[in-house]
Amino acid sequence: VLDARIFDMTNAVTARDYDRAAAVLAELFRMQTEPIAILAALSRELRQLYTARLALDGKKDAVWVKDLWRMTSDYPAKKLMQSARAVSRSWCRDAVRRCQTLDRRMKSERNMDAEGALKLFLMELAGAR
């Protein structure tokens, strides 16, 4: 369920629908999903999106992405390719880097407002589009 909701949230960001992305994040918080678990799933999704963007730039197709990530179906690879068309390579690279930075902060800073940091990160992703 978490991966599917993160997929929805990332698609909303790439579609410039911040309200929908924020609603998904709020739903995950209401379900008491740990912020670090949300970030881990988001990190994977952003890395996959970056891979799809690189595939597009390299004239590769969804099957290549599917095989690389060992997906069992074409559907998620096709959706990734569709989302990747809406973002630039630099946006993807920066999103992955910022995600890594937030991950280090969440794991090392005491008394961090992890939910607030995730909300801010989501707004930054949406705003940087």
What residue ranges belong to the model's regions?
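Small-residue-rich helix-loop
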Residues: 1-91, 129
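Broad gene-expression machinery/nucleic-acid interaction feature
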Residues: 8, 101, 117
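Generic structural concept
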Residues: 39, 43-46, 96, 100, ...
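Charged/polar positions within long, soluble alpha-helices
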Residues: 51-54, 104-111, 127
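Residues that form generic nucleotide/phosphate-binding pockets
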Residues: 68, 83, 98, 121, ...
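C-terminal capping/gating helix-and-loop segments adjacent to ligand/active sites or protein-protein/ligand interfaces
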Residues: 79-111
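Acidic, carboxylate-rich catalytic segments that either coordinate divalent cations
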Residues: 112-129
